[in-house]
Amino acid sequence: DQRETFMKTHLLTMTAGAALMASLATAEEVRVYNWSDYIDEELLTKFEEETGIDLIYDVFDSNELLETKMLAGGSGYDVVVPTGTFLQRQIQAGAFQKLDMSKLSNKDNMWDVIEKRTAQYDPGNEYSINYMWGTTGIGVNTGKVTEVLGADAPITSLDLVFNPENMEKLSSCGVHFLDAPTEMIPAALTYAGLDPDRKDDEALAAAEEVLMAVRPYIQKFHSSEYINALANGDICVAFGWSGDILQARDRAAEADNGVEVAYNAPVEGALMWFDQMAIPVDAPNPEAAHTFLNFIMDAQNMAAASNYVYYANGNAASKEFLVEDVIGDTAIYPDEATLDKLYTVTPFPPREQRSLTRMWTKVKSGT
């Protein structure tokens, strides 16, 4: 499974002499750490061909994993892609360097509507550029869910995944939840009728209650396996990221396997998140990192990425190059009414983060 493999676009095998040459020319290498299944790999080849810079590309599937590397320092990466809430905390911890705008001629392509929203995590957008944004919501195998719950199954509502009566029935065809407490807790709070950005003990207890009530019916907590599981018909519901579920829809259609996947941002409200590209403070090659960011901000390159991964991007100039399947899909580029229903959240402070981690461990173990 490509999600599980450690993906590298370039394997450097060289003699000691060549290795010495390479160490003298480190500016000619850039190391990027991005989410899995999150770019058109042809862009990686194109970058190497256009710039002559060797690109080493590794992947992860959890913000917590990335944050551990960022806060420890010495990751060896030149470009990383944290989600906004995590980025904010990492900027405050001194993990990133300010971008040199003089090296980012394509910055003008960026979309002011999105930059206004990302500024709450990165004031003035001085440390990062938006790569992709999306929502967290409900992916369903429409045929199986209808079979189990009937034609009026609440596939657009949090009731589908948080009402124990529904979940007990759905457990017969398989349900996956994201292994991402900062995504799942706001959804549980929304279902409980509370502010999704609350982080106090009372709110966490309410979220825990919602999750524990359906815990017996959750087959797995994982942040990437649900794509193939949905596409193959192995599960019938996933609470996950918009573009990942739409990728599952696309894979099922390509396989022509009779599986029909649909994505919905919950009508009660959905989390809107932003994945930002940033340069670590100790990046070995900040020069090459800027070259990579500028390449990504090219309108056609950014469009190619979105057309491949089914996520909206923060690049206004890319819109004319987006395929209709992407720009015309309100699950990817929401209409005004849906946008109004989307909420953003702030980072968890250290004490609350520890409470969250403890609670999440408890929920996952079901004890």
Regions found by a protein language model. Give the residues of each.
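Extracytoplasmic ligand-binding site segments that recognize negatively charged/polar headgroups
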Residues: V81, L87, I91-Y217, H222-A231
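A ligand-binding cleft/hinge motif common to bilobed small-molecule-binding domains
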Residues: F86-R89, V237-G258
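Mature extracytoplasmic/periplasmic domains
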Residues: D275, P280-K341
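Periplasmic-binding protein-like
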Residues: L204-A213, Q219, N257-A278
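Gram-negative bacterial Sec-dependent N-terminal signal peptides
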Residues: T5-T26
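Early extracytoplasmic/lumenal segment of secretory-pathway proteins
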Residues: E28-Q90
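Short beta-strand->loop
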Residues: Q97-D108, A255-L271, P280-A283
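Conserved C-terminal helix/tail region of periplasmic/extracytoplasmic solute-binding proteins
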Residues: N228, E336-T367
